């Protein structure tokens, strides 16, 4: 009974079993390319977003599509129920449809594309979603390149402006040193608004006075004036008028139409004599005509000096 239960194993079978165990052990310790590829695919399915290369990204997308469509509409999971990959013609048709309208895929459009291409509507939706994500990424790259080019252009312009500024600054320093070497200190020129004009009133008043005196002197003839002794002296009427104006130095003479207060001959002459003994002030003139001329010239010189000290009021006061 015990002998019948024993299983006899051929030596060749023992070698075959040993070889299988040895191969399994070696594969487990070292790893074969087939086992490594299978393990890599298994890990990628568990962690589909840890890789970064383009090929691995495409492989991840394919694995995701396979996982999405691994279950058919009846809910049975099998390898035969997985959807087929898109052909080149189907991809071109989907690309043309995407170029026409990049917005969200409408249900009617999705159903029409799926019916025309012979694929499931869900597969069309997934393809459009992935294609739209790639398009947005491409647009971001284009925008980044455009902004980077604009930044580089602005930076180049700033560098050029800085170089021009430095060149102008060096020229200013060089010119300043040359001016200092020549003994001319650079001073800013005053603004036109700050420059004060010298008033021309004194010159005009002086010219007017001289011209008026010359005109009166040339136009007037020689008149005869008499003194208290009865002697006649020929002298210009202009000088006589100037002498009278100089002798009339009362405050009332400065105001037009003013009347002088009454005065008696006693106050003027100290109570001695009468008007007959002393001639009136209108004929009290020097005998010598040269003295009258000197008095006139002295009055004109005093007026000019007063005009220089008070340029705005002296000539008006004199001629009033």
UniProtKB/Swiss-Prot annotation:
Keywords associated with the record: DNA-binding, Homeobox, Nucleus, Transcription, Transcription regulation
The keyword Lipid biosynthesis appears for this protein: no
Tissue: Expressed in roots, leaf sheaths and blades and panicles.
Source organism superkingdom: Eukaryota
Assigned GO CC terms: nucleus
Disordered: region residues: 181-209, 249-282
Skewed-composition ranges (Acidic residues): 265-278
A single GO molecular function term of this UniProt record: sequence-specific DNA binding
Known DNA-binding region: 79-139
InterPro entries the record matches: HD, HDZip_class_I_plant, Homeobox_CS, Homeodomain-like_sf, HTH_motif, Leu_zip_homeo
Compartmental location: Nucleus
Entry function: Probable transcription factor.
Family: Belongs to the HD-ZIP homeobox family. Class I subfamily.
Descriptive protein name: Homeobox-leucine zipper protein HOX25
Organism field: Oryza sativa subsp. japonica
